[in-house]
Amino acid sequence: MKCRIILGLSAILFFTGCYNREHISRLDEAEALLQNKPDSALTILKQLRREGSQAEQARYALLYSEALDKNHIKVTDDSLIRQAWSHYKHHPKDLRRQCKTLYYWGRVKLRAGDKPGALRLFLEIEEKLKDTNEPYYAGLLY
């Protein structure tokens, strides 16, 4: 009986680990395609489930928001990008993802007609980038 329990738990852990690696691999693939083939990235992201650790869910939310924006799909509901922010705001060392999250959140706010809200987010990015050399993100703002 004890052996069956151990065997069952081992199988669950094995298959969960395989799924997790596959999920992360698909997120990596979508991220790599975002700049030049955003439609392909969006297709991959639509095939994935919003599961995994909080970090994986936040990454998915950020990538999906970015893919929607790059495919010119107008989104005015900020619930998805706020999910990413609820994770990245606690990770100041991940400045790149913090800035991307704030940027795409600002883009959603602009589309929703909330220009002051968008401006606050863009100014927050500017403040975060003040002491760094991140020309890509500064370029997005201007």
Please identify what each model-predicted range represents.
Residues K2-I5, G17-Y142:
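A "functional boundary" signal
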Residues G8-F14:
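Bacterial N-terminal signal peptides
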